[in-house]
Amino acid sequence: MPNIKSAKKRVKVSERNRLINKAYKTRMKNSIKKVLLALQEGKSREEVEQLYKVAQSAIDKAAKIGAIHKNQASRRKSRLIAKINKHFASKE
């Protein structure tokens, strides 16, 4: 337990930031799961791309506030679009 005033404040601030980061990461992961689920269910390319836009936005927002690193955001987006392209390339 911190005794110094600034240390007490840091505990509060870090807990608040942890919860904010957790919310952004959860939103990001859920949107990615929706895209992957749509691929498994065989949804149309338009529907999947619409879900991808939502996921891309969630990933970028998480990176913007620092919940994830910008390189991780880039990697997640590129891997997700690669899966989408691979899925629809095999269908054609």
UniProtKB/Swiss-Prot annotation:
Q: Which GO terms describe its cellular component?
A: cytosol; small ribosomal subunit
Q: Carries keyword Cell cycle? A: no
Claim: Ribosomal protein is one of the keywords in the record:
yes
Which key words tag this protein in UniProt? Answer: Ribonucleoprotein, Ribosomal protein, RNA-binding, rRNA-binding
Query: Its GO biological process terms?
Result: translation
Which GO molecular function entries does the Swiss-Prot or TrEMBL record give?
A: small ribosomal subunit rRNA binding; structural constituent of ribosome
What PANTHER family does the annotation carry?
30S RIBOSOMAL PROTEIN S20, SMALL RIBOSOMAL SUBUNIT PROTEIN BS20C
Q: Which HAMAP family match?
A: Ribosomal_bS20
**Role according to the record:** Binds directly to 16S ribosomal RNA.
| Family that this chain belongs to | Belongs to the bacterial ribosomal protein bS20 family.
Q: What name goes with this protein?
A: Small ribosomal subunit protein bS20
